[in-house]
Each structure stands twice: as structure tokens, then as C-alpha cells.
Amino acid sequence: MEAIFPLGNYATLIGESDGIIQLTTWNVGKWDGKLKIGDYALISPGVRILSAKMITIGNSCMFGRGAYVTDSDWHGVYDRNEVAGSPKEVILEDNVWIGDSAIICKGVRIGKNSIIGAGSVVTKNVEPNSIYAGNPAKFVKKLDEQEIIPRKNFYSNPKKLKDDFEILDKLVLKDNTFFGWVKSFFYRNKDH
């Protein structure tokens, strides 16, 4: 049986209690949503990817916090009871970076190595090796394809990666102490 949304190798998904990741396919009635995520993806907290037809995400793509990708309007324009409206496939080619809270709408193709600025709304295709930003997203700058280093290179040296993660862990956890843990155990924050 084919997976509804296969996730590529070496994917990094970062969820938080206030930033749950939502990967959804709508498979009811005539709708047969599919989602394919390539290798080396980075999906940050609060990302929502919703498919009623097909969303294809290439290798080494990155999603900033709260980014939203959909291939549907989720309701008909005239018939508001029409559940998924008229979905259109979305394609993100390899090494695309979607900024925080950006919205990628149905029917869009984003070319390889492109960057979508934070808070942008993309309703039309994006050329490869480009930066687009704004609402609606507009061309900002052409990128030199020869200068681009894809996310998969992050994994090319496992020893360096391990060392980098140890440094990162020390930075993130440096303020954690036994006393802090005991205090949090007995005086819990009501939100956690």
C-alpha cells in the first residue's frame, strides 16, 4: 500500500506545544489528497501543509515557523458546502525555503533554490533561483545558482554534525539546573 504522505530521509520536524505541525491529506468522497516530502526537509513549529489533491515538496526544502501550504480553497466559491472547492496541485522544487508565516496557495509551482520571504502570500508561480516577497509575492532578486549550498550538505560530515549538535545542546540547555528541575516539578506552570 502506498503511503498517503511519504516523508523523505533525514527529515527534521520541530514541534512545540504552541506550534504543532499539521500534515493533512483530505481523503473523503471524491477527494484523494496526497503529500510527498523529499529528503532533508526542515519543518519548523506551526507549519501547516494541507492537501486535497497533491502537494509535492522536493529535497532540502525548509519551512519557517507558521508557514502554510495548501492545494485547495477548502470551500467552494459559490457553494460553501463544497468541502474542498477546486484543488490544484502545488509543487515546491528542490532546495526551496519558505519564510515564517508565508502562505503558498493552490496551483503554485516554486522553482528550485528559491526563497519566499516571511509573511508573503504566493498565488503565482515562482521562477527558479529567485527571492520573492510581499502580499502578493513579487520578484525581489535573482540568486546565483553556483553559490547555493543545499540543506543536504549539512549531513555530509556525520562527525561534524554530531559535534555541532553537542554544541547546540550545550547552548540550549546551559541554564537547566537540578534546582530548576525540582522547582518546575513542584511549582508547575499551569500552561505546561
Segments (PLM) and residue ranges:
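A short, glycine- and basic residue-enriched loop/turn
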Residues: 90, 107-108, 129
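Domain-scale signature associated with acetyltransferase and cell-envelope carbohydrate enzymes
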Residues: 1-70, 93-94, 112, 128, ...
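Short glycine/proline- and charge-enriched loop/turn segments
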Residues: 76-83, 149-153
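Beta-rich strand-turn-strand
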Residues: 50-52, 100-114, 120-123
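Conserved catalytic-core motifs of eukaryotic protein kinase domains, centered on the activation segment
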Residues: 73-74, 80-82, 108, 142-143
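Short-chain dehydrogenase/reductase
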Residues: 62, 97, 115, 121, ...
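Glycine-rich NAD(P)-binding loop of Rossmann-like domains
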Residues: 82-95
